[in-house]
Amino acid sequence: TETETTSFSIPKTDQPSSPKFVSGQPNLIFQGNAYSTDGKLILTEAKQNTVGRALYSAPIHIWDRKTGKVADFTASFTFYIRPNSDSQVVADGFTFFIAPVDTQPRGDGGLLGVFNREEYDPTIHTVAVEFDTFHNQPWDPDYIHIGVDINSIKSRITRPWNPHYDTYSIAYIAYKAATNELDVTVTYPNSRDYATLREVVDLKQIVPEWVRVGLSASTATYYSAHEVYSWSFHSELGGTSSSN
C-alpha cells in the first residue's frame, strides 16, 4: 500500500498572498467559543469561563493496526495571547491536541478545553501539547510552562516557558514514529528566546487509528484572548508492513 499523507496550511505556505483565516473557515470544525474572522482564528475572547476549539475537519489516519505503522507528523502555528487590559494576570493557555474523531470540548480554565480532571483517564485517548500561562493547583508546576499531556491535564513533562505578550509566538511540533519522539519548540520573531522539550510518546497505546487534530484555549476567573494567525500540519503514514 502507498504512503498516506494529510496536509493543510492556512494560509497556504506556497501562496503567501492566499487568504488567511476567513469567516467560517471551510476546512475547520469550530467548538465552544471559537470562530474565525478577518485573518485570524479566535479560540477565546478576553472573557471569563470560556473554551474554544478548532479541529481540522478531515479525520487523520495516525496509525495502522494491520501494518503496525505509525505516522510521522509536523505541526506549526503562530499564536498571540492578548492579555486582559484590566488585569496583569494571563490565563489559561493553548493546546495542540490529538483526539478521537468525535472529540468534544471539556473543562475550561486550567483544563484547557481538552481534559475534565487531573486523574489519568485512558478512555479519552488524547495527547495534548500545552502552552500554559497560569499556575493551576494542584497539578501544574509553579512556573509558566510548555508540557505534554497524555490522558490527563497533569503533564508528563514540563519545561519553563517565558511567553512574550507583546508579539506573536511560533510553535513547532514534530513527531518521529521510529523513535516515538515528540519535539516541541516555541520561538518569537526578533528574539533569541525559546522554549523546547522532547518526550517519548507511544501514540499506538494512546489514541485510536483515526483521529482529529485541533487547537484549543480556555479561560476561567482570569482570562486572555487567544488568537491564531496561521496553522499548518503534515502527516505521513507508511504503507509497508512492519513484519517485512
Curated annotation (Swiss-Prot):
Region (Disordered): 1-20
Gene3D superfamilies: 2.60.120.200
Entry keywords, A to Z: Lectin
InterPro entries listed in its UniProt record: ConA-like_dom_sf, L-lectin, Lectin_LegA_CS, Lectin_legB_Mn/Ca_BS, Legume_lectin_dom, Leguminous_Lectin
Single annotated GO MF: carbohydrate binding
Record flagged with keyword Transcription: no
Subunit details: Homodimer. In contrast to other Lathyrus lectins which are tetramer of two alpha and two beta chains.
Family named by the database record: Belongs to the leguminous lectin family.
Protein name: Lectin
Lineage of the organism: Eukaryota, Viridiplantae, Streptophyta, Embryophyta, Tracheophyta
